[in-house]
Amino acid sequence: MTIPMKKLLPFLLFAPLCAQAQPLGAGTYKYVEWGVHGGADIRKMLVIEVLPNSQYCLLSIMDYKEDSAAGRWQRSGNSIRLGNGLRLQQRNGQVYAGQQAVQYEPYASKDREDYAAGVCKEIEGNSTPSR
């Protein structure tokens, strides 16, 4: 399953670079490790879209292998548990997806949320949803 990088680059290039302590909820959670060659040289990437309708999708690139998932999420105390078992939580002001520190950006507009929902719909159509 391949999602064109041009659809994901807006998430990566135009997001604020600082993580702010705020309650976790709908928005984009991401981590990117760039290689020495710049923009197209992505070594590791994790992008998770958590939608307000209890749906989520994620795309990861680790060791040049792509993976994706889509499904439902649940709030569990002060964390969010994705249907694939991954937990988003905040510790000492930093947001984590499992053990990986990530940036969290709440949706700034309805247009941004709708764009993320479209990306999730495409990922869901190309992967088996987790339950």
Could you say what each language-model-derived stretch is?
Residues 22-44, 71, 75, 118-131:
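Tryptophan-anchored aromatic micro-motifs
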Residues 37-79:
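N-terminal glycine/threonine-rich, aromatic-flanked beta-hairpin/loop signature
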Residues 7-17:
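Sec-dependent N-terminal signal peptides
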Residues 1-5:
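N-terminal secretory signal peptides that target proteins for export/translocation
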Residues 63, 79, 94, 125-127:
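Secreted/processed peptides and extracellular or luminal domains of membrane proteins
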Residues 97-131:
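C-terminal partner/receptor-binding element of secreted or periplasmic proteins
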Residues 31, 55-60, 80-84, 95-99, ...:
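Short hydrophobic/aromatic-rich beta-strand segments that constitute the beta-sheet cores
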